Amino acid sequence: MNIQALLSEKVRQAMIAAGAPADCEPQIRQSAKVQFGDYQANGMMAVAKKLGMAPRQLAEQVLTHLDLNGIASKVEIAGPGFINIFLDPAFLAEHVQQALASDRLGVATPEKQTIVVDYSAPNVAKEMHVGHLRSTIIGDTAVRTLEFLGHKVIRANHVGDWGTQFGMLIAWLEKQQQENAGEMELADLEGFYRDAKKHYDEDEEFAERARNYVVKLQSGDEYFREMWRKLVDITMTQNQITYDRLNVTLTRDDVMGESLYNPMLPGIVADLKAKGLAVESEGATVVFLDVFKNKEGEPMGVIIQKKDGGYLYTTTDIACAKYRYETLHADRVLYYIDSRQHQHLMQAWAIVRKAGYVPESVPLEHHMFGMMLGKDGKPFKTRAGGTVKLADLLDEALERARRLVAEKNPDMPADELEKLANAVGIGAVKYADLSKNRTTDYIFDWDNMLAFEGNTAPYMQYAYTRVLSVFRKAEINEEQLAAAPVIIREDREAQLAARLLQFEETLTVVAREGTPHVMCAYLYDLAGLFSGFYEHCPILSAENEEVRNSRLKLAQLTAKTLKLGLDTLGIETVERM
């Protein structure tokens, strides 16, 4: 149920009947304060200006044409021309009933699209670090939300599995295998990469061999392809452990690394030349873009092939976008890549559009994000100043959550405690990130994220268990409740019901904007409204069975909404805390 969309259409028709143009925008918003109703139409200002009349005068005319019978109990004009809409309690009750009768809580499915989501993208032969956290979990929230809404979602893990460094890595793997007489495990990927680089820098004979190996790998030599595959397999096996711990939905089947696009690059360059878009400049192949200017104010040259014949990330990104449209048949492509890559992506996409590889009707969207910072406001590092491994961060989260949970539940069995600590610890790390606007940097703070008050995972998980405890005390099952009517008489009942029915609107925003913090804010607000409702509207000690069952149904929909909302964020819920 999308009340915002319903009201938008009703108000728009009334505006047109009052003389507004057919493309008028009612600007329906959820009201910030209860005294302004549940929704507010703010579009009279802009339209009245076009019509040369006072906004309040237009609002009065709109009201004469606006039929919200059965939807709103009161509609009033406020200030210079805002229209405040108060939803009818009977309308709220009816739609709470409908939401409870639906597995999807009444959420409609929009027209199905094929949506490619590019996220996570770690590098081969390197361990995942905290810099991979945001892309991985924000992207996964987008995937979960879009899939719930009914879209066909293709996860694209754009792994860094190609490039000149692989000659060095294969040469070092070969040396390690010879010295260790047989198979070896890359237990310490970071150390492996570091040692390979050290040998490459210090041993000229090793470096020469590495350079030869690059040529052999790129020419398709089977031995070197096999060694390369081994490096990819070991890395992705380790990464899968991290993905599973993080409760993200990526699997090995979602890997679409740089190597996938490598065979396409010569054809891309040749085609761009044939189209007259790419030209030779100082030995390199360059595309000049009018939309980007250099310091002299001239069109900026974007190199797609170097003098030595090597390709660049831009070339790969051009091939990648083309592949996603032509082969994967994407209707929309979302990229969860940090904000530092923005200009690079814009240049690649400008070439893609110019060449006609992806039509303008297919959005290519950079859902960029800021950095994770330490308490000092600088990029999050270890005490020694090194990069924090993601696995180490999750280990610490688990340890801290374990202590916290044991303190609150000293008699809890060990296996139950471990399960709860995992849900709380991993949930805390994810929620702390997801609850911040992705476009900004944020401060990583253990104390804040593990707190049981405020907009945190432990608070949200506890809020969910608190609602469930009402049902345990009521000793009533869902089947018994199903036939009971919902009756809304109290203001707090109406406020809770209206917020519950805004779940679909929240999902729609997250799906459109890729902003998980909107869902976090909604769930936190919902938990707060339930708390006020629980305090002021007795459930188990209600004046009669009819009121008791009605309030139980509001509690039931609250629990289901909290659980489903947290699930779209990849946050586990627990039955008891």
UniProtKB/Swiss-Prot annotation:
Any Pfam family matching the protein: Arg_tRNA_synt_N
Cellular compartments annotated: Cytoplasm
Short sequence motif 'HIGH' region: positions: 122-132
Organism domain of life: Bacteria
Xref: InterPro entries: aa-tRNA-synth_I_CS (IPR001412), Arg-tRNA-ligase (IPR001278), Arg-tRNA-synth_N (IPR005148), Arg-tRNA-synth_N_sf (IPR036695), ArgRS_core (IPR035684), DALR_anticod-bd (IPR008909), Rossmann-like_a/b/a_fold (IPR014729), tRNAsynth_Ia_anticodon-bd (IPR009080)
EC annotation from Swiss-Prot or TrEMBL: 6.1.1.19
Alphabetical GO biological process terms: arginyl-tRNA aminoacylation
Main location, first listed in the record: cytoplasm
GO terms for MF: arginine-tRNA ligase activity; ATP binding
Keyword Magnesium carried by entry: no
Keywords on record: Aminoacyl-tRNA synthetase, ATP-binding, Cytoplasm, Ligase, Nucleotide-binding, Protein biosynthesis
Family in the record: Belongs to the class-I aminoacyl-tRNA synthetase family.
Summary of subunit composition and partner proteins: Monomer.
PANTHER family tied to this protein: ARGININE--TRNA LIGASE, CYTOPLASMIC, ARGINYL-TRNA SYNTHETASE
Protein name: Arginine--tRNA ligase
Record gene name: argS
